[in-house]
Amino acid sequence: MMLSISLGFLACIILKDSLCIFCFSFCFLLYLNERFHSKRILIVFMILSLFSIVLVKPCKEAEKGIYTISEIKQSYYVAKNQRTRVLVQSDLDLNFKDQIQVNSLEPIHTDDNFTLFSFTKFNASKNVFYKTKSIRILKKSNSLKSKLYAYISSQKNSKVLLSLYYGIHEDTIDEIYTMLGYGYISAYFIVFNLLKRKYEDKKIRISLLILSILFGSFFVFTLSLTRFILYQISYLFFKSKSDQIGFTILFFSILYPTQVLSISFVLPILLQLVSYFCTDYKWIVQKMVLISVLFIYFKKVDIVSFLLFNLLRKFYGCVFLLGMFIPDFVTLKIPSLTIHYAPQYVFILAFIVVYIQCLKHFKWKYMILFLLPFLEVFCNTFFQVYTLNIGQGDCSVIVEPFYKSVVMIDCGQSLYRDNVERIIFPFLENKNIHTIDTLILTHDDFDHSGGYDRLKEKVKIKKVIKDSKDKVNVKYPFYLLLQERKAKDENDSSIISYFTYDHLNYLFMGDASKEIEKQLMDAYDLKADVIKVGHHGSNTSSDAAFLDSLDCKIALISAGYKNKYDHPSTETLKTLDHLNIHTFCTSTDGSIAIYSLHHFAFIVTNDGLFGIIRA
């Protein structure tokens, strides 16, 4: 009963939207009534479903004032007051419970892209939406918690200790063990098994529970530690395994409603459900769940770590207990053999179905799940056009159905980061793209072609086009326009791409100016449903007469967040708005994708915007 109610409450928390919660709750109430025939259960779930609507509301906007450091991460801090929490990125040496004066704040923003980790969304999941711009220290803490952190940070093997005790991930330990808190949990069971030879089970559990709470108070209550403490409390109050799991799910969802999809919570709960429901081949199902979840969350699996999972878990438990006394060999990372695979929706849906079936009864045929990575190419039926968010630069990827061809237009680089290493290559890898059939470098500017040398080291590139007179080798109409033109500078020499698929016409302008736009109008009778606006939306491009002649529906702009050029210009945005052209910009919307299948097409952005493109 408790497990059913808790899972229903968890579903409400995940849905977030009030209307979705209402619709789900109505259906779930019918299920509960059919199964339990109890009015009390129905009333309890109705109260919880209403409570979930309150829980999922975002916290209040952060304000200037006095904050206290509550979390320490590898490259930043989190500070809180009575109302909210903020991100602190500072060169100041801060410690737990230090008081700071926050003088100014700004929204957290990162260049987010499909399939890649989003630091902005990660913090939003913890109800942290703002970061400090200016701070000063008011009072250094003299608490035991801050002294412990200072002492551990000064140790020779501090990287290992900080990872195990505080969840501050370092490369010395595989991230999965840090996130799941297996250092502490394994240490707990080592101590438990030693003590139960002499003492009563319940007394040991109560003592270790108190110790766990004290540990969290003096160190940090990570998600994994909180979940583990809740489970230990449930063990003392409930005999039924299902009630124990249900209690853990319910109270974790109440305490951390925005983080119920964290791997620190999801994976242990999935494994506990397997342990409770599965009657045969339990070990195989657990391994299947483990490897699937690792692929879904991390998009890679270290085979060595996976095979030695149980052994390493116990090893890190020993390190946790003896961490202050162990030599430096612990900092040596275990050799890795990594398999990379970014599951698409087909795999995730198949995993959910197979997981539910395995809880009932395992069958060997369910292992066909792991053939999907090899079959997903045949599921890719959409024509896809991606505009990546690489800051103040350009990079677009055009993928034909079933990966028949991949064309990239530009691979811009940045002075502040390696765009290829941080964004372009990981995106291609996560989309299972290992070969680029044609790379079009529109012109020789760093923000358009600067990443080429780095990219060719990472990905096989069959053909590179730097001249409009060349041809793109694809089996759909793809033209490089205005081979003969009067160009006054490098920008006006930009290769202009025009292609058609599924009855949609696309025009990519590079950095071409209004003068080139006039030459295009004189040379061609062009119509374009989608235009990649020239020169990042600068007022040197996007002439109103030119845009009007194209009869565009959608405009795509690639520009950096708060860039020094003020791209896109207000003038360009007003022109697009006046012509009723729906405009999407990477600086505000993140990466942008257009999908089409015959006469059906739609556009989505990384920030969650969605729209159907009418033919």
Language model features with spans:
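C-terminal regulatory/interaction regions
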Residues: 1-7, 27-29, 320, 328-382, ...
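Internal transmembrane alpha-helical bundles of multi-pass membrane proteins
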Residues: 6, 221-366, 512, 518-520, ...
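Di-metal (Zn2+ and/or Mg2+/Mn2+) metal-binding site signature of metallo-dependent hydrolases
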Residues: 173-199, 434-457, 533-545
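Membrane-interface helix/helix-cap signal primarily in integral membrane proteins
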Residues: 49-177, 421-429, 435, 469, ...
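N-terminal leader/targeting segments
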Residues: 1-61, 128, 145, 150, ...
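Core dinuclear metal-dependent hydrolase active-site scaffold
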Residues: 361-435, 469-530, 539-541, 588-615
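Active-site-proximal loop/helix segments of hydrolase catalytic cores
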Residues: 258-259, 442, 446, 450-455, ...
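Aromatic-rich juxtamembrane segments at the membrane interface
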Residues: 125-232, 236, 480, 505-514, ...
